[in-house]
Each structure stands twice: as structure tokens, then as C-alpha cells.
């Protein structure tokens, strides 16, 4: 790839998901086992760097999957998701009308519950916390992020991500 002039490897979503396209993230902290392990990712990033290449991840941050750790509509995960309990640590990430069956979904697609980007605990989890998703994967070797449907994210949210990446 380097000999062909490639300088950046852009990876479509790599995180655990219930689908093969992985735009319905189930867990931002785990790489889909179909793609490899976190160690494989670290190795890829290190090898890319030795060849003068960068690895860019695809961040899907305006919705998750309904079958996710965070929403957990099907009860797959052992922790309480927002669809299971109003006591879930993720409940405030989503807008229900009323809880639990009616909620905002990306473009009305019920398997893609929309996230409230203005929720402080969500911003902390994705961006601001020292162990946030953005920081975690940068430390693992990613060089940057491509933001899925960035036009639908608030400008301030994108600016916060940019500040962390820079």
C-alpha cells in the first residue's frame, strides 16, 4: 500500500455490533471479533506508523444500536440498558416518549436509537473523560476519527472531539 502512495487507512466502524456494517454500535470499547482483537488493532497501528501511514477510525456518535450495552433492548448484556430501566446509567443518553417503547431514533429507524449529544454523561463518556472513547482509541494507536453523519452532530460536539484529537 505504501508503494502505491497510500498514507491513510480509513477503517469503517470496527466496534462490536449486531450487524456486519457496524453502524449500530453495541460497545465502543470492544472491537468486533470478526475483525480481530484490540492487540491486532494496536499492531496494525504500530505497523502503519513505521510505514509512514495513519489509521483513522469511523465514529458513529449520534446513535447506537438498540442491541447495545447502552440501550440493551434485547437484554443481551448483563448491565441495565436504557430500554430496560430508568435507573440505567445510560437512560439519560436517550429521549423516550414515553419510556420504554417510544424513543427518538436516527431517521426513524427503531434499531438505531438516537443519542442526546447534549447529555453530560454521554459527552464525558465519548469525549471528555480521561478514559473517553476518543482518548482510549487514540492511545491504542488511532491517528484520528471520521465522524459518521457529522452534519447531524452539533458543532460544539465536533469541536470538543477536534480539541481532544489535536
Residue ranges with predicted function:
Residues 33-35, 150-156:
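Acidic-and-aromatic substrate-binding clefts and catalytic sites of carbohydrate-active enzymes
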Residues 10-13, 148:
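Residue-level recognition of beta-strand->loop/alpha-helix junctions
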Residues 3-7, 14-136, 140, 161, ...:
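Substrate-binding/active-site clefts of carbohydrate-active enzymes
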Residues 56, 144-150:
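Short catalytic-loop micro-motif centered on adjacent basic/acidic residues
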Amino acid at each position: 500500500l505504501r508503494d502505491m502512495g497510500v498514507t491513510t487507512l480509513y477503517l469503517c466502524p470496527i466496534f462490536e455490533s449486531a450487524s456486519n456494517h457496524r453502524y449500530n454500535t453495541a460497545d465502543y470499547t470492544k472491537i468486533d471479533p470478526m475483525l480481530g482483537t484490540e492487540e491486532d488493532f494496536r499492531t496494525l497501528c504500530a505497523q502503519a506508523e513505521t510505514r509512514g501511514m495513519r489509521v483513522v477510525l469511523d465514529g458513529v456518535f449520534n446513535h447506537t444500536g438498540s442491541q447495545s450495552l447502552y440501550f440493551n433492548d434485547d437484554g443481551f448484556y448483563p448491565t441495565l440498558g436504557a430500554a430496560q430501566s430508568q435507573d440505567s446509567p445510560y437512560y439519560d443518553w436517550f429521549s423516550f416518549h414515553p419510556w420504554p417503547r417510544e424513543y427518538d431514533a436516527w431517521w426513524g429507524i427503531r434499531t438505531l436509537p438516537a443519542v442526546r449529544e447534549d447529555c453530560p454523561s454521554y459527552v464525558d463518556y465519548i469525549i471528555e473523560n480521561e478514559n473517553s472513547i476518543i482518548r482510549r482509541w487514540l492511545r491504542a494507536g488511532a491517528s484520528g476519527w471520521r465522524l459518521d453523519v457529522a452534519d447531524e452532530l452539533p458543532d460544539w460536539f465536533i469541536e470538543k472531539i477536534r480539541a481532544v484529537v489535536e
